């Protein structure tokens, strides 16, 4: 690895001189004399960056120099302001081993600070945000326990405070779950085991009592920050299992009952989902029997509350149970031998009542066999655990969120009532010297109650005024609504009347147009009828003329035959007769032309009779043209007669 080279300075500065300077001078020296640039080896504790002697610091390493300063400085706030700048260049400064001399094996600097009870400085380092090295914590709380007799984690030490844990919940999800899952060094177990014992209570650097109520605070902060946890839950984002044993073989519930630590028992079941319906201890007994044997009187009332609110009763009759013959629990896979411990799920499968209670404690609300979700009847028997809250999608599953809030309200009501009961039970007899204080307190209480009563009266009066104002507004709104509806109705009627007039006018115009059209149609039909009648008359005349023409044709044909016979029998011998016939031929030719023209006129009139009739008929002209000239002349003579 390449070590960073210190910038040139005026010469070595004795360590004592550095330590004797005030904060501003020390800060200036550290900032100006530290290395202006560094390599990537600053992320390794054993790199030369942290171990190499620096001449300007009296040939001491940066770890020894800063360690000497913060260990000897009584003002921990000032120490933090100085080291916060140093950490920007040396992120693993407090991870590195601190040695007082060469023979000293040394321990990490942050543990040295703990041994010197620099709790406030360590607390500041715990939430320190390194801008240049964001993922690197200032102290390795996620990998090492504090160097004390029992090997506690940071969460179990004087370094931690309520506000600090809340800050970590808001700002660093990774740190949160790393801290929750750190186990105790020697006895093992998580923070659930540690705070389940009354013996482990202590006071932190802010004089806060760190006892079993830490369990409640942690659960509260995690649930309050659920929206942020929904957006990003890391791989280590799990709460330690409350049913896991420590190195001594105890689970947190057993530790709480053996020491009659009733708050821990309540928090473990209602907030962390500890399985309370199992058997406990060496005698294989119920939770209640285990508490009685350990003379845990305060815990008995907690167990009674848990049994009343979170236990399941049978919902299968004896006849149904006998009818099933063999009933297997889908939870433990053992046969259910008694219908009193049998619960039928909405999907039709069966479970032991105690198996179902333990399953719901873990916020597992599906049948393990068919994966059907449980119904509301089962949800109402579930404790308001962290796991349940973290598993609810608040934007879509409003119904389940309401069920959780209802369970949480029941839990809070019990805590309030039970605390009042314990306060009355454990209230000591007051000594005579406290009588004055009692009277003063009673007087002050009466004044507060009187003030509250007045406030309540004012609130009631104000509420009545608001309700009256709301009522008036509602009446005005109803009146205004009626007026608007009436105006809209009137407007609709006017629009409807207008449309009706338009429709009536259109109907009249339509009727007029229909009458005109009917008259035009009638006239056209009459004209057509007249035309048909005229065509019929013309056709009738044409038929008559055709019949007459046929008759004339028949006569012409007959005359032709007679003419042939006459010419054969009687040929004229005189010239005069031939001349006479020749003149007659001219006359006949003229008449024949006149007849042809007449037939053409008649044929034009008969064009409407169809092609078949015209093709089937022969005109007189066509027959006459086929005859010899002499025969034609004779035919004209016949026509003249």
Swiss-Prot record:
Keywords: Host-virus interaction, Metal-binding, Modulation of host ubiquitin pathway by viral E3 ligase, Modulation of host ubiquitin pathway by virus, Transferase, Ubl conjugation pathway, Zinc, Zinc-finger
Signal peptide range: none
Purpose: Probable E3 ubiquitin-protein ligase which accepts ubiquitin from an E2 ubiquitin-conjugating enzyme in the form of a thioester and then directly transfers the ubiquitin to targeted substrates.
Record InterPro entries: Znf_RING/FYVE/PHD (IPR013083)
Name of the featured protein: RING finger containing E3 ubiquitin-protein ligase WSV403
A molecular function (GO) term: zinc ion binding
Reaction(s) this enzyme catalyzes, per UniProt: S-ubiquitinyl-[E2 ubiquitin-conjugating enzyme]-L-cysteine + [acceptor protein]-L-lysine = [E2 ubiquitin-conjugating enzyme]-L-cysteine + N(6)-ubiquitinyl-[acceptor protein]-L-lysine
Source organism per UniProt: White spot syndrome virus (isolate Shrimp/China/Tongan/1996)
Pathway the protein contributes to: Protein modification; protein ubiquitination
Cystine pairs: none
GO biological process: one example: symbiont-mediated perturbation of host ubiquitin-like protein modification
Zinc finger (RING-type): 329-371
Cross-referenced Gene3D superfamilies: Zinc/RING finger domain, C3HC4 (zinc finger) (3.30.40.10)
Enzyme nomenclature, EC number: 2.3.2.27
